[in-house]
Amino acid sequence: RIRNTKRVFYSSSACMYPEYNQLEPENPNLKEDSAYPAQPDSEYGWEKLFSERLYLAYHRNKGLDVRIARFHNIFGPLGTWCGGREKAPASMCRKVAEAKDGDEIEVWGDGLQTRSFLYVDECVEGVMRLMDSPDFRGPVNIGSDEMVTINHLAEMAIKISGKNLSIKNVHVKQIGVRGRNSDNKLIKQNLGWGPEMKLIDGMTKTYQWINTQVNSNKTQPENSIQI
């Protein structure tokens, strides 16, 4: 406001949605108006929720023109792909790229937990639509509504690779919520936007890039970005 900034974008997250709406793998409720009563399942989700409120308070009290998007698992080439901070698509691509024919790849939990994943190029398009909107500020979901199980995601990476691999489900205490999928009705209604790229196509591009990194014996590249 002091610098007379015309418009500000805040990248929120689907992690701000209440845990009780994400207990069923097949039927998560992540409509924008389902955020309250608040009950995110992590400190990260609470931080995103409170930050949304802070930006909206600046809008109400100071007239700051804000735009808020709730991202749903953005992925693609040049993203983080190793080290434990990568998203599931990159993790599966890396595990498959590192594996040899006949190997197993590990999937945490029973693999029946569901998620949706949005390719980075489409995320950029959604953000641009939101920033160019004269009066729609959100909060609004920017994500894919193509929901898959994590086992299916792993199978997809294996199919892309052409390798003969199997999946080993590993019991762990914490695997996150059981179901998460972007509800895109609001953004389609207000901005006419919806993702067009199929998950298999985004995974193919991502696998090809990560496979190159693995076969070049690289660690996390310096020019990668966390998405």
PLM region descriptions:
Residues E98-I227:
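C-terminal substrate-binding subdomain of Rossmann-fold SDR/epimerase-dehydratase oxidoreductases
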Residues A38-F50, A88:
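The catalytic Tyr-X3-Lys active-site helix of short-chain dehydrogenase/reductase
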Residues T5, W46, V120:
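Catalytic Tyr-X3-Lys loop
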Residues Y20-P28, R53-M131, D145-M147, A154-S161:
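NAD(P)-dependent short-chain dehydrogenase/reductase
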